Amino acid sequence: AIPGEGTNVPLWILGSSLYGAQLAAMLGLPYAFASHFAPQAMMEAVSIYREQFKPSAQLSQPYVMVGCNIIVADTEDEARKLFTTSQQQFTRMVRGTRGQLPPPVDDIESFWSPIEKERVSSMLACSFYGSPSTIKGKLATLMEATKADELMVVAAIWDHQARVRSFELLAQVMD
């Protein structure tokens, strides 16, 4: 058996830099920007992709997906605490110490140094956490700014039930 045999799986370019945007535009392919971990060049990359896009056999006009870390909970406080898992995970990447997804903590400030906080906050700039109403507003702003056709969502939530609940709430927000 050959996975995907007989299907027409579209080719995408996933990038976190301007080069990926230029390549996707030149090849006339859909472009997914990895703003869920490298958001600094997102707006410029999306703009370059749209400006330089050349139609292809696969795609007649630009098609953009942006990535975002999104954690939705019933309360702002619960979402903030759940988000500390992502903050710890990215801090570990900065330190070069990977590991399993850590449980949330009450006091993230005691986990990282000011320099780590600054670096991680920059990496997580396209990350939203909050109640459904908060997330609805933040997503509307993101989608309006990027004019993205699709959204790729990452939810690094330690507790499985909380992760499922987050996606349930996000689905309600997206309706």
Language model segments and positions:
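Hydrophobic faces of well-ordered beta-strands that scaffold small-molecule active sites
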Residues: 11-14, 31-34, 62-69, 151-153
